[in-house]
Amino acid sequence: MSTTTTMRAWTYMQSGLPSQTIVLDDEAPSPSAAELGPDELLIAVNYVAMNSGFTTLMRSLPPQPYSLPHIYNRQKRLGVPEFEFSGRILAVGSAIPSTRPDLQPSTLVLGCCAAKRVFIEGKGALAERVIAPAAQLIPLRPLSTVTTQDDESPGPDPAAPPISLLEASGLSACGCTAVQVLDLTKLVAGDKLFVNGGSTSVGMLTIQVARQVLGQTGTIIASGTDTTLIRSVGADDVIDYTAQRPLHEFLRTHHADRPFDAIIDCVGVAELYTHCEPYLAPGKLFINLGAMTAKPTFWGLLSFVWNQHMAPLWPVVLGGVPRSYQFYSARPNRETLGRVMRLVERGELRMVVDSVWEMRDAKMAYKRMESKRAKGKIIVRVQEE
């Protein structure tokens, strides 16, 4: 049973499969209001959305991987995983009343833990309470107005949030990624986009945001095995990658005559980029969001990171690809979170949930993540709303 000084939290002390390395601590030290910086808030966590990238890190690196004291000595490492969550504000830092009056105690919020707390201090979100920066939080506000098609339609309830607290838990990092990556592509109405990994959580959000950018005249092609689901979020066509191998050969054969104006890879398949010249238009961008193909070892992850940095630098005369490349990860901030929520409020963006697990069953949730068969977000209910 947690108290004001202790809480339930899942922790891990070594690299490996999360389903095998995490341990539930019923008396983990709880953060308190006394620890808050001026721009930080104490949150009671209700839901945590799991992230495939964090699973890759946990398999390859120990907790607090960027903490210098741990790198240079054998000091015990301990970490709480994950960073995306939703919950209720318990306390606010001294600057919050003047800088963020929308963030007050008892307000429902969605957001992310600061990278410093997760990767250096080992204080992630899979716990009953977390400290998070105001810049990476946004309130889950009720709809401000009721819009109806006619007088007989009741319209949405203005007192109800546009999305549930459960669904909101997966919108901060993934939602910001989808919005920011579409900005990077500079796509316009009528363009053609390929999304690899269309049934991943970030893939489905990216497709939905892209539909708003491209309009009905644009074309969105995605890869995946659940055609109905991927089409339901806005894709025009779905390629079953299990039936079309290698995928890059299928794309070369069927899309070289009208190349894509951008490719967004949510999985991290290197061959898609190295062979993309025929099916990605000159001057257009290939963006990788995924690391699902990285080998789950320290050296495997190091090799993956090295390749991400070298891909855009390798000269064409030495075998490089004559197309621009960028590896991108989310940069959650207030402005982008606001854009995400406006899309949600207009009914243009929704979170697809693969499965929901109780706090005690987090190991099973990680097994689902490790299977790489999830279609949408895997969510852990930390405590009741």
From Swiss-Prot:
Which sites bind substrate? 156-163, 309-313
One Pfam family of this chain: ADH_zinc_N_2
Q: What Enzyme Commission number(s) apply to this enzyme?
A: 1.-.-.-
Keyword Nucleotide-binding among record annotations:
yes
What broad class of enzyme is this? oxidoreductase
Residue stretches in coiled coil: none
Pathway listed for it is: Secondary metabolite biosynthesis
Query: Which of this chain's residues are annotated to bind NADP(+)?
Result: 64-67, 199-202, 223-226, 241, 289-290, 372-373
Which SUPFAM superfamilies does the record cross-reference, listed alphabetically?
GroES-like, NAD(P)-binding Rossmann-fold domains
Q: Name one GO cellular component term.
A: mitochondrion
GO molecular function (one): oxidoreductase activity
Cysteine pairs bridged by disulfides in the record: none
Q: Which UniProt keywords apply?
A: NADP, Nucleotide-binding, Oxidoreductase
Induction, per UniProt: Expression is positively regulated by the oxaleimides biosynthesis cluster-specific transcription factor poxB.
- The superkingdom listed in its UniProt entry is Eukaryota
On subunit structure and binding partners, the annotation says: Monomer.
What the record says about family reads: Belongs to the zinc-containing alcohol dehydrogenase family.
Function noted in UniProt = Trans-enoyl reductase; part of the gene cluster that mediates the biosynthesis of oxaleimides, cytotoxic compounds containing an unusual disubstituted succinimide moiety. The first step of the pathway is provided by the HR-PKS poxF that serves in a new mode of collaborative biosynthesis with the PKS-NRPS poxE, by providing the olefin containing amino acid substrate via the synthesis of an ACP-bound dec-4-enoate.
The protein's name in its UniProt record: Trans-enoyl reductase poxH
- Name the source organism: Penicillium oxalicum
